């Protein structure tokens, strides 16, 4: 079955910003994919270009991939890279490339009568990731709130994905109650997490109380994690928090202290995106998942560099950072072949596209980071509940 038509349109993301959707036609099948966007971005990720270039880029992409087999994903993705001609999709845009790439994969899966996770992951796609839920937000996602960008929860005691998401939603609801009880005004940030004028220390304390209430109510063990987004704190010499300025050595010590004090399961981007040695040193000191996002940007070659020095032990996977499904799959394979865990992630500017849920299962990710509330987040979480029903003997992944 060949690709017969490619069409782009401008749509809107969860922040009300314009983004791009790609539609691929193959036979009777029409498949669509939309591009998300990030507020906190790594310098090495695929470039996003204006969605309003859609007519020009549609013409180029159409010439490049129409007539190709919808089942030859690697060749389609290579054609997109060759069309662009740069190493970061700075000409046609990672947003245009990833949507075409994913739409082709979705079309192929539909033609075969397979869910996307089974088409991409094959017979080994049998486990569900735990939802990594952002429940208190700050940093670039909620100005005037905490210095740490995200305070996260992981319902490790859940036996099903439905139970896991219910626990995360319960923590989110308890936080609302606690803020109200304490007279603290809290609004929702970009990802639906609560944003309030509180310190990082207060956030840890309030979240600990919310988790305890949920564990008592539901009987499900919940662990805590953080996304520091440290590149946003780094001024070239120090990590600048609202109440302190830390050298690299002090930042590593602070992260290790937080991991121990709050029994953190997960720390994302604890140091700035160029500090491979700092990542490696912290990874040696703590027993939790140390995840690289801005440092790796879903780039296979950069991930290899990190592996060589022992930077982190977990890789955050964002397909739009890479630009193609094949490139994203390569990044996943390199990470897993070297003993690193994988976390599949949304962006702060999201859409209702549910593709990410399928990729998390296909890549056997430990966690899926896609928020807790909000239609653009729930679309992925509800899709995972549907996937759980589709599986013959579904089980949660081992963390």
Swiss-Prot record:
<feature type="active site" description="Proton acceptor">
    <location>
        <position position="318"/>
    </location>
</feature>
<feature type="binding site">
    <location>
        <position position="293"/>
    </location>
    <ligand>
        <name>Mg(2+)</name>
    </ligand>
</feature>
<dbReference type="GO" id="GO:0005576">
    <property type="term" value="C:extracellular region"/>
</dbReference>
<comment type="similarity">
    <text>Belongs to the enolase family.</text>
</comment>
<keyword id="KW-0963">Cytoplasm</keyword>
<dbReference type="InterPro" id="IPR020811">
    <property type="entry name" value="Enolase_N"/>
</dbReference>
<feature type="binding site">
    <location>
        <position position="369"/>
    </location>
    <ligand>
        <name>(2R)-2-phosphoglycerate</name>
    </ligand>
</feature>
<keyword id="KW-0460">Magnesium</keyword>
<dbReference type="InterPro" id="IPR020809">
    <property type="entry name" value="Enolase_CS"/>
</dbReference>
<keyword id="KW-0456">Lyase</keyword>
<dbReference type="Pfam" id="PF03952">
    <property type="entry name" value="Enolase_N"/>
</dbReference>
<feature type="active site" description="Proton donor">
    <location>
        <position position="191"/>
    </location>
</feature>
<dbReference type="GO" id="GO:0000015">
    <property type="term" value="C:phosphopyruvate hydratase complex"/>
</dbReference>
<protein>
    <recommendedName>
        <fullName>Enolase</fullName>
        <ecNumber>4.2.1.11</ecNumber>
    </recommendedName>
</protein>
<dbReference type="GO" id="GO:0006096">
    <property type="term" value="P:glycolytic process"/>
</dbReference>
<dbReference type="InterPro" id="IPR036849">
    <property type="entry name" value="Enolase-like_C_sf"/>
</dbReference>
<feature type="binding site">
    <location>
        <position position="149"/>
    </location>
    <ligand>
        <name>(2R)-2-phosphoglycerate</name>
    </ligand>
</feature>
<dbReference type="Pfam" id="PF00113">
    <property type="entry name" value="Enolase_C"/>
</dbReference>
<dbReference type="GO" id="GO:0009986">
    <property type="term" value="C:cell surface"/>
</dbReference>
<dbReference type="InterPro" id="IPR029017">
    <property type="entry name" value="Enolase-like_N"/>
</dbReference>
<feature type="binding site">
    <location>
        <position position="227"/>
    </location>
    <ligand>
        <name>Mg(2+)</name>
    </ligand>
</feature>
<comment type="function">
    <text>Catalyzes the reversible conversion of 2-phosphoglycerate (2-PG) into phosphoenolpyruvate (PEP). It is essential for the degradation of carbohydrates via glycolysis.</text>
</comment>
<feature type="binding site">
    <location>
        <position position="268"/>
    </location>
    <ligand>
        <name>Mg(2+)</name>
    </ligand>
</feature>
<feature type="binding site">
    <location>
        <position position="318"/>
    </location>
    <ligand>
        <name>(2R)-2-phosphoglycerate</name>
    </ligand>
</feature>
<keyword id="KW-0324">Glycolysis</keyword>
<dbReference type="GO" id="GO:0004634">
    <property type="term" value="F:phosphopyruvate hydratase activity"/>
</dbReference>
<dbReference type="InterPro" id="IPR000941">
    <property type="entry name" value="Enolase"/>
</dbReference>
<dbReference type="GO" id="GO:0000287">
    <property type="term" value="F:magnesium ion binding"/>
</dbReference>
<dbReference type="InterPro" id="IPR020810">
    <property type="entry name" value="Enolase_C"/>
</dbReference>
<comment type="pathway">
    <text>Carbohydrate degradation; glycolysis; pyruvate from D-glyceraldehyde 3-phosphate: step 4/5.</text>
</comment>
<feature type="binding site">
    <location>
        <position position="348"/>
    </location>
    <ligand>
        <name>(2R)-2-phosphoglycerate</name>
    </ligand>
</feature>
<keyword id="KW-0964">Secreted</keyword>
<feature type="binding site">
    <location>
        <position position="347"/>
    </location>
    <ligand>
        <name>(2R)-2-phosphoglycerate</name>
    </ligand>
</feature>
<keyword id="KW-0479">Metal-binding</keyword>
């Amino acid at each position: 079955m060949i690709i017969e038509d490619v069409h782009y349109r401008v749509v809107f993301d969860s922040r009300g910003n314009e983004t791009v959707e790609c539609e691929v036609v193959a036979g009777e099948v029409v498949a669509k994919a939309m591009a998300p966007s990030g507020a906190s971005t790594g310098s090495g990720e695929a470039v996003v270009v204006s969605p309003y270039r859609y007519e020009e880029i549609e013409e180029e992409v159409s010439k490049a991939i129409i007539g190709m087999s919808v089942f030859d994903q690697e060749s389609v993705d290579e054609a997109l890279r060759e069309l662009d001609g740069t190493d970061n999709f700075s000409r046609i845009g990672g947003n245009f490339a990833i949507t075409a790439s994913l739409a082709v994969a979705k079309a192929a899966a539909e033609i075969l009568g397979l869910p996307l996770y089974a088409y991409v992951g094959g017979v080994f796609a049998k486990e569900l990731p735990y939802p990594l839920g952002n429940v208190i937000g700050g940093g670039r996602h909620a100005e005037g709130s905490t210095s740490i960008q995200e305070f996260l929860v992981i319902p490790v005691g859940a036996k099903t994905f439905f139970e896991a998401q219910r626990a995360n939603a319960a923590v989110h609801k308890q936080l609302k109650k606690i803020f109200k009880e304490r007279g603290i005004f809290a609004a929702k940030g970009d990802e639906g997490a609560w944003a309030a004028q509180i310190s990082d220390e207060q956030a840890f304390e309030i979240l600990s109380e919310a988790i305890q209430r949920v564990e008592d109510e539901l009987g499900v063990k919940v662990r805590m994690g953080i996304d520091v987004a440290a590149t946003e704190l780094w001024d070239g010499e120090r990590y600048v928090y609202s109440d302190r300025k830390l050298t690299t050595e002090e930042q590593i010590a602070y992260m290790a202290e937080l991991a121990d004090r709050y029994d953190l399961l997960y720390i994302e981007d604890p140091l700035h995106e160029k500090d491979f040695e700092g990542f490696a040193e912290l990874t040696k000191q703590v027993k939790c998942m140390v995840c690289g996002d801005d440092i790796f940007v879903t780039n296979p070659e950069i991930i290899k560099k990190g592996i060589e020095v022992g930077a982190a032990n977990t890789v955050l996977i964002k397909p739009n950072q890479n630009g193609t499904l094949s490139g994203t799959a390569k990044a996943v394979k390199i990470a897993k072949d070297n003993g690193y865990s994988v976390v599949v992630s949304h962006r702060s500017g999201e859409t209702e596209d549910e593709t990410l849920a399928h990729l998390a299962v296909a890549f056997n990710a430990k966690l899926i980071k896609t928020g807790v509330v909000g239609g653009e987040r729930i679309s992925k979480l509800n899709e995972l509940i549907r996937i759980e029903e589709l599986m013959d003997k579904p089980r949660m992944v081992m963390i």
